[in-house]
């Protein structure tokens, strides 16, 4: 037996099938295997793109979802129910803010003069660079964005300086230009760190959106520079704009199974910090081996998940990408690297036009604490089963290699 060679691709093939069995728990393994491998053959025959590009087509094939992803979580699967969905309020929220929501529609049209803080050309360039990836600004039209940039002011900070303190009234929203900052939450007289900002990101929006005290303390751990936006301008432009976005997204967010363990107020906070991105056919959304910075929920379209094979190479001698999953509307991906703090375990490509709701890593850590247990147990469940049956978990620990 020691001289028997395992054919190239056999391990990956069986791992994909095994994961689907674990996920779907079919009553008849033989019928399920026939259907699974038939669709696998059909998917392969329809693939017509080069090896390194995402396959095209519309097959409903999902041979490895939940395994990597940045693997996918199937909105139709019952995994979350089997994993004891946390009861709202049972787990310690990283941020728990409950208050009456500010309603922009009830506020009279403002007649206050626009706030303008003069800036040099060099300052303006630095500000634009710092704000280019801020999701709260993504849905602003050019005139609104210009007003926001005009109103922002620069603030330099020193080591150990408290930028905001838990329990204080919210006065400003902050965008980080440079510096590192700890996020501290105090509960039952115990203070703990729940995250860190590293030279990019933003904070302070929740207190301004919901008329509530600051939910966390932000302390500078290095010298740094911030751009602040006053409360009045933030509410006049950002909050009103987000109210329109909320009407568009709230029903969709409520339909995502993963988020059903959250309270209504928490789901609304997700709507307020989430952004929308559109991808064209074949466009790469995330890249295997890269650092993770966002979490994705598919609003419309189809996404192909691929990993680099260790046994297949393309004509250039590089590891060939192999499709292991397809995910659709309501499914999410990109969470594995955020939960494990590892590089991306897979790449994701748009199949046709795709629209995703995107949450940055800071908002993910801050708002999805109650869901983290489900995601971690999903990952552990698949890894344990794969190690037990195959002796490995397809290098989820070090996916970039």
Swiss-Prot record:
| Residues recorded as bearing N-acetylserine in the entry | 2
Question: Which PROSITE patterns does the protein's record reference?
Answer: CNMP_BINDING_1, CNMP_BINDING_2, CNMP_BINDING_3
Specify whether Cell membrane is a keyword of the entry.
yes
Its tissue distribution reads:
Four types of regulatory chains are found: I-alpha, I-beta, II-alpha, and II-beta. Their expression varies among tissues and is in some cases constitutive and in others inducible.
Q: Which residues carry this modification: Phosphothreonine?
A: 212
GO BP: adenylate cyclase-activating G protein-coupled receptor signaling pathway
What positions are modified (Phosphoserine)? 48, 75, 77, 96, 347, 392
Report residues binding 3',5'-cyclic AMP 2.
Answer: 258-401
Q: What does UniProt say on post-translational modification here?
A: A second phosphorylation site has not been located.
Under SUPFAM superfamilies, the record lists: cAMP-binding domain-like (SSF51206), Dimerization-anchoring domain of cAMP-dependent PK regulatory subunit (SSF47391)
Kindly list the GO molecular function terms attached to this UniProt entry. cAMP binding; cAMP-dependent protein kinase inhibitor activity; protein kinase A catalytic subunit binding
Q: Where in the cell is it found?
A: Cytoplasm; Cell membrane
Q: Which UniProt keywords apply?
A: Acetylation, cAMP, cAMP-binding, Cell membrane, Cytoplasm, Membrane, Nucleotide-binding, Phosphoprotein, Repeat
**Can you list the GO cellular component terms from the UniProt entry?**
cAMP-dependent protein kinase complex; cytosol; plasma membrane
Q: Keyword Phosphoprotein: yes or no? A: yes
Please list the disulfide bridges.
none
Region: Disordered; residue ranges are 43-65
Write down the superkingdom of origin.
Eukaryota
| InterPro entries in alphabetical order | cAMP-dep_PK_reg_su-like, cAMP_dep_PK_reg_su, cAMP_dep_PK_reg_su_I/II_a/b, cNMP-bd_CS, cNMP-bd_dom, cNMP-bd_dom_sf, RmlC-like_jellyroll
List positions binding 3',5'-cyclic AMP 1. 136-257
Pfam families (alphabetical)? cNMP_binding (PF00027), RIIa (PF02197)
Annotated region (Dimerization and phosphorylation), positions in chain: 2-135
Family the UniProt entry places it in: Belongs to the cAMP-dependent kinase regulatory chain family.
Q: How does it assemble?
A: The inactive form of the enzyme is composed of two regulatory chains and two catalytic chains. Activation by cAMP produces two active catalytic monomers and a regulatory dimer that binds four cAMP molecules. Interacts with AKAP4 and CBFA2T3. Interacts with the phosphorylated form of PJA2. Interacts with MYRIP; this interaction may link PKA to components of the exocytosis machinery, thus facilitating exocytosis, including insulin release. Forms a complex composed of PRKAR2A, GSK3B and GSKIP through GSKIP interaction; facilitates PKA-induced phosphorylation and regulates GSK3B activity.
- What is this protein called in UniProt? cAMP-dependent protein kinase type II-alpha regulatory subunit
Q: Which organism is it from?
A: Bos taurus
Q: What is the lineage of its organism?
A: Eukaryota, Metazoa, Chordata, Craniata, Vertebrata
């Amino acid at each position: 037996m020691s001289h028997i060679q395992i054919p190239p691709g056999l391990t990956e093939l069986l791992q994909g099938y095994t994961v689907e069995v674990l996920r779907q728990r079919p009553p008849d393994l033989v019928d399920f295997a026939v259907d699974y491998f038939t669709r696998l053959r059909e998917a392969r025959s329809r693939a017509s793109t080069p090896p390194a590009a995402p396959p095209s087509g519309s097959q409903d094939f999902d041979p490895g979802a939940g395994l990597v992803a940045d693997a996918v979580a199937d909105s139709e699967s019952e995994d979350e129910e089997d994993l004891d969905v946390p009861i709202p309020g049972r787990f310690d929220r990283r941020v728990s803010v409950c208050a009456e929501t500010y309603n922009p529609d009830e506020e009279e049209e403002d007649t206050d003069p626009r706030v303008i803080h003069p800036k040099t050309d060099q300052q303006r360039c630095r500000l634009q660079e710092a704000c280019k990836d801020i999701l709260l600004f993504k849905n602003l039209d050019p005139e609104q964005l210009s007003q926001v940039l005009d109103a922002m002011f620069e603030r330099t900070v020193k080591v150990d300086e408290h930028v905001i303190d838990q329990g204080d009234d919210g006065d400003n929203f902050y965008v980080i230009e440079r510096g590192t900052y700890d996020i501290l939450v105090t509960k039952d007289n115990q203070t703990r760190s729940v995250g860190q900002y590293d030279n990019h990101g933003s904070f302070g929006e929740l207190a301004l959106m919901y008329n509530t005290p600051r939910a966390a303390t932000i302390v500078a751990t290095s010298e740094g520079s911030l751009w602040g936006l006053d409360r009045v301008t933030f509410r006049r432009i950002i909050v009103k704009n987000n109210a329109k976005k909320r009407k568009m997204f709230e029903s969709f967010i409520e339909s995502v199974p993963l988020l059903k363990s959250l309270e209504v107020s928490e789901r609304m906070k997700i709507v307020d910090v989430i952004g929308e991105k559109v991808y064209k056919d074949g466009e790469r959304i995330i890249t295997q081996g890269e650092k993770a910075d966002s979490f994705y929920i598919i609003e419309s379209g189809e996404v192909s998940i691929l990993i680099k094979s260790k046994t297949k190479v393309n004509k250039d001698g590089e590891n060939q990408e192999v499709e292991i999953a397809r995910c659709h509307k309501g499914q999410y991906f990109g969470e594995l690297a955020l939960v494990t703090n590892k590089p991306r375990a897979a790449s994701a490509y748009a199949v046709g036009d795709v629209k995703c709701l995107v949450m940055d890593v800071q908002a993910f850590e801050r708002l999805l604490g109650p869901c983290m247990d489900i995601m971690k147990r999903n990952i552990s469940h698949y890894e344990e089963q794969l190690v037990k049956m195959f002796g490995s978990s397809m290098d989820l620990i070090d996916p970039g290699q």
